[in-house]
Amino acid sequence: MKYLVLALCTYLCSQSGADENAAQGIPLEAQRLTGEPLVAYLRRSQNLFEVNSDPTPDFEQKIMSIKYKHQKLNLMVKEDPDPEVDIPPSYDPRDVWKNCTTFYIRDQANCGSCWAVSTAAAISDRICIASKAEKQVNISATDIMTCCRPQCGDGCEGGWPIEAWKYFIYDGVVSGGEYLTKDVCRPYPIHPCGHHGNDTYYGECRGTAPTPPCKRKCRPGVRKMYRIDKRYGKDAYIVKQSVKAIQSEILKNGPVVASFAVYEDFRHYKSGIYKHTAGELRGYHAVKMIGWGNENNTDFWLIANSWHNDWGEKGYFRIVRGSNDCGIEGTIAAGIVDTESL
């Protein structure tokens, strides 16, 4: 595996919000739209994605601060993709790894922990894939979010996925799961916000949840020892910014973590292929990129969000592929599982 060592400023979107809006030819008046005027503009100016009149609730609490756009790091950037990998026109790992139970949608609740939740989800998938579906474990986003501080970021305020992958190498991460999951070391500590169909209602949420404390022990009543329950990685890197490199990485090793700029129009996404069209920059978000495809001659990435399975397309969304829309292809973080630690 070849890498290029770079000392660089990693960013979640290659340009500022205003610069990207200008670069895409988005009129100034469209950049400033919110609410019903924005919804009306989106419905008449594009046909790639359907729009919700009601915006995503707790939107500001689900995304990261703008300060997580930049970080100075010495990064291992994976060089050219494997030339022997044959890239299919579409790919969905759920169809290939049908026995992997880790391919489900998480719920980060009112906490900007997307960087930890998406990384834990990608690691869980990669463990299943690396073991040929013999090992099924949900990695704890809580362990990453609460204990990888300050090097990874600041818990519910946001963080950097590449640092979470590095934490997986050097500290290891225990088993986890969704809120109140039994028989795991450290399940997610924050309950889902509001009503979600027939799911258990735990209550509403107000503001951004405080980051829970780091506890280097398993929850009471679980017959697991924290240190023994750890799983480890053996490599962490940024994937080269090219469509083929990203596709090759996903095919070979499993889902990756993508970070992108979130604009006001994403708040109203309902279904279809998202492309930034209007609205101001609101923050940044990290998600699990699992595959790709094409619909009506539009290439897209297939992405798992962490806003419950009643958001978007059953918890997933698609975004245009090949144009680095919102910086989605610019900072792809990934890593290799140490199978001996499983």
UniProtKB/Swiss-Prot annotation:
It holds the Pfam family Peptidase_C1. Disulfide bonds join 100-128, 111-156, 147-214, 148-152, 185-218, 193-205. One of its GO terms (biological process) is proteolysis. This is Cathepsin B-like cysteine proteinase 2. SUPFAM superfamilies: Cysteine proteinases. Expression of the protease correlates with blood-feeding and suggests a role for the protease in blood digestion. GO terms for molecular function: cysteine-type peptidase activity. Residues 1-18 form the signal peptide. The keyword DNA repair does not apply. Gene3D superfamilies: Cysteine proteinases (3.90.70.10). Keywords: Disulfide bond, Glycoprotein, Hydrolase, Protease, Signal, Thiol protease, Zymogen. It comes from the Eukaryota. Residues 19-86 form a propeptide. Its EC number is 3.4.22.-. InterPro entries: Papain-like_cys_pep_sf (IPR038765), Pept_asp_AS (IPR025661), Pept_cys_AS (IPR000169), Pept_his_AS (IPR025660), Peptidase_C1A (IPR013128), Peptidase_C1A_C (IPR000668). The active site is at residues 114, 285, 305. Belongs to the peptidase C1 family.
